[in-house]
Amino acid sequence: MKEAKCERQIHEGKIPNEMGHSIVRAQTQKTGEFLSMVVNTVNDYLNQTTLESLQAELPIEKGYCCDVLSTLRRMAVFCEGGAEACRRLLMQEPFQEARAEKTLYNVYHQCIEEFFMPKKDTWCENSRASYTGVSAIEFYHAVPASLEQLLLPLSAAFLKMREELAHYEASGSSMAPIR
């Protein structure tokens, strides 16, 4: 009788389930590693790129070029914050599953969705091209090859992570919007 009550409480999420913890922990670890990779890749590009070097590579409108660089900086900041949140969660004992789920929810909306629909509308997602090996990102204006070379592998990685987090969010977890 006592075992049945305990099983029901585990199922209802009132008692932590070790298997659930390990799944959420693994997703938090993977997400943190992904975000760290994005931060390193984007920061390497931004540290080597100036407005002038982009315009020398391909003459483009200065305002649009500034917006693209601003979007990349914003993405790096959000991803760095998400990576730090994941790292801190993984260091805590006991592992806080509910906080991890909220963090993954925030990463999904602040980092993943922001990549495909940036605030400044510097590019958009081409959902038809996303699974063909072509970048899922379409720019509104022509951009230098170095920028396309940055975003092609990133868009594939973001697509994969979006699928993982969307599946995770829809798999019956208690993730809910943060108000």
Swiss-Prot record:
Pfam families: DUF3907 (PF13047)
Domain of life assignment: Bacteria
Alphabetized InterPro entries for the sequence: DUF3907
Protein name per its UniProtKB record: Uncharacterized protein YpuI
